[in-house]
């Protein structure tokens, strides 16, 4: 199975981070992580990317519909447009379910953004590939 290594950028929010495969603490201490068993850029399906709310995804709290997200890998550049965002419970993993007819990107971080300790919820951003 191939893995994701690249960069995610959300220019309006001044987010620019390396993306590595996996979401273990060691990976997330250094980079955003591609959530295992989710799609890869360019594939039909749902790509999951997670990062800490107090570091790389700190500015995600200011996301808006239509914000542009770019994922750059060795295979090319993929551009997405934010279509929605919401707060869910950690057990609501259905946000990562495959999207059989679309190329989607789901960003995941802990919520609330200014919470001390283990955050009780997750902030989810959903985007559709535009090119």
Predicted regions and their residues:
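Solvent-exposed, non-transmembrane regions of membrane-associated and secreted proteins
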Residues: 1-131
